[in-house]
Amino acid sequence: MMKVPVMIAWLKRAEKDPRILDRQFYYDGKEDLTAMQDIKPRRAIAAGRKYTVEELLHYMVNYSDNNATSLLYNALPPQELNAVLDGMDVDNDTSAGNNDITVHGYSGFFRILFNAGYLNREMSEKALQLLTLADFPQGIAAGVPKGTPVAAKFGEFNQGEERQLHEFGIVYHPKGPYILGIMTRGRDAKIQAEVIRDLSALIFTEISNGSPVKGPGGMQ
């Protein structure tokens, strides 16, 4: 789930100098971090090639490629990533062994991107556009009518037999956009994805049948 703040940190750099998105990094392939992913990226960067930051953001956000993430993460000074967390007022417990974060805390990334409260409007829109291309059709997007825009990011974490599968996003409902965050624990990622899908469908239906109250900035 740290892919979203990593993306934000790079786009914050690009506010000052858009040329940073053309900076290139070389992937030597000595370590394949996608091997630990249960949900494999449909597309991933290839060993022996150079990629621009723009391309790496695409692989990291759209396909959840851990190798692209590693290149971007390792090129960020820790203080820059911490500045994102502090500047966005996200309740993040960095002292915990697993760097835990609450549903409310993580949803803060999406609230502030939607309202352009940390990045400027151009870069906030760029971030949301990347998130609408995320390749995880079996989660939140599966629970809403086809064609409904969803700007979302999923994440997984495995510890022993336990599987954690989470997804957060903005669903652009015809009545108004809303944030949805779902965290699951279990032993079968497929079943957990189905839970996310079913909850997404339930919430979409409830909003369709009701009259949601608009929150700040038009967000429900």
Residue ranges and their predicted role:
Residues 16-43:
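Short, glycine/proline-biased beta-turn/loop segments that scaffold the active-site neighborhood
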Residues 44-59, 69-220:
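Penicillin-recognizing serine hydrolase domain
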Residues 2, 8, 12, 29-31, ...:
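A mature extracytoplasmic/lumenal domain signature
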Residues 64-67:
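Internal, conserved structured core segments that host functional sites
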